C-alpha cells in the first residue's frame, strides 16, 4: 500500500538485502509529501510564529494554527483551544502529571495506571509520588495480556483522582476497552487520560466518543516528524491547571511582581514551537486521511492476522498478548525457544529485517511476563504479506543456527 511514497523502503541493507522495516512501533518512515512540505516551509516561509506583523510570520502562523485545526478534526475535539502541542506523548503525560497533580491532588491521593504501561506513563507518576506523596495503583492483567476490569473497579477509593492508561500496549498489541475504562472512571467521578501513542497511527480516534478527559499521541509514530506531539485536554481541567513551563508566548502580562498567563492552549506552550514539525504533522494526518483511516486499519489487521498465523507454524514460537487479531493492534512481540531476543534481532538485521529487541520501555510488564525482553515486529500501512513471509523465513534461518 503506497510504498512508492516512502523512498527509504527501496534501499538495500548491507548493500545486499532489501529493507524490511518492521520497527514501526518505535517510529514510522515519512512519506515524500511530509518531507517536501517541511522543506518547502524552511525554504520559503521560515519565520517565528505569533510574534511578527510581517508577511512571513503571518504565513508561518497560519500554517501552525492550521495544523492545530487539522489535529482537532483528526481526533474529533470540540474546541481547537483544547489542543496543546508538545514534543511527544512523553511530554504530554509529564505535563498532565505535573500540572494536574498541582491543581487537583494532595498527599495520599491516588492515580490508577495499568500493568502494561510504557515507562512514560509510569515514571512521571512516580516522580509525583516522590514530590507530592501521591499513591500509584496498578490494574492487573491476565496471562494473555487482557486487563482485569473487575480488579480495576476495586481499585477506586475516595482518594482516587485520576486514571491514566494506554489505549494499545506497545509490547502486547492489546487494544484496551478504553470506552469502558473511561466510563468506569466517570462513574466514580474520576477523570481519565488515554495514552494514544500506539493507537492514533492505526485506527480512527474520536475523543468525544471515548469521552476521555485527556488524550496524548506522537507525530513520529504516524508518518510525521519527530519532536512533535499532541495533548488533548478538556477545557474544564486545562483552565484550572497551572502552566507546565514558563517563558515566551505563554504569558498575558509580565511585571517583576506578577505574571498573568495566556489563554488556552498557549498557556501550556512556552517558547518557540516547532512550527515546521506541526506543519509536517498536519501533512502526515492529511496523508493518512487521503488513504482512508478505515482502509489502513483493515490492511494492518489483516497483516497482523496473517503474521500471527504464519509465525505460529515455527516450533518453539511464543507470542505474547492476545492471539486473536481482532483483540490486538499491529504489534507482535515474540521469543523462540531459548534464543535470546538480542541474538534474534541481530541476526534478523543481517538479513535486512528491522525489528526491535529488549524490554520496549516496559520493564514492569516484562517482570509480569517473567522475561527480560522480546523481539517485536510492528507493522505500518506500507508493509505487506511478502515482508511477513520474509520475517518468518528469517526467523526459521536463525532458529536453524542454534
Q: What does each of the following model-derived ranges do?
A:
Residues 1-402:
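Pyridoxal 5′-phosphate
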